[in-house]
Amino acid sequence: AEYGAPVTAHEVFKPVTVTTAPDGETIYDFGQNFAGVIRISLQGSAGQVITVRHAEILNPDGTLNTTFLRSAKATATYTCRDGKQTYSPRFTYMGFRYAGIKGVKPEDVEVEAVALYSDVAHAGAFHCSNELLNRLQSNITWSAKSNFVDIPTDCPQRDERMGWTGDINVFAPTALYNFELSRFLEKWLRDVKAEQRPGGGIPNTVPVQGYGCLLYTSPSP
């Protein structure tokens, strides 16, 4: 079996608000930015097509703002069969707070979202009388969860989700106050070893060798 912390389903979010955008798309706000997938349940008709788009922020007019996704589509399309059914994307995940759905009326579908991240246990917690600091701690924790999906990434929403070595090098000391990361990081360091170049150089992303330049090259003997 593969060594490491498996990616599993965690928090389940219900929409905190449901609105209709000017173009008719139904916008669901889950109240938290996270990495995961949508889950819809409905009484569908054969051939009915439902499209779900994802975004972290909204435009002033209430539509999804996908500017920062670059070329990522962050879109799931589902074709229904007759009868009651539940759909959730497989073999992928998105970084989002908002989901826009077309192809089904909001009163005809149950919508929720599931956070996905590596199964790392909490190692510590922080709470104080200052709500701004509490929010900062919450943001730090959720940023870690969203970027601990099998490898340490720098963002969960864009058109690349690489294991940037510099980012985790900076963040690991902080993350270890919040999470037990031994299996997660040991597995990734095995990936780093596997990607190390003959001259000692380490790519700036692991485990995608050759993406970008070298981060570090050891001196020649």
Predicted regions and their residues:
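Extracellular/oxidizing-compartment recognition motifs
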Residues: A1-R158, G166-D167, L181-W188, V192, ...
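Generic alpha-helical structural context detector
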Residues: P173-L176, R190, A194
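Conserved small/polar residues in nucleotide/adenosyl-binding loops
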Residues: Y216-P221
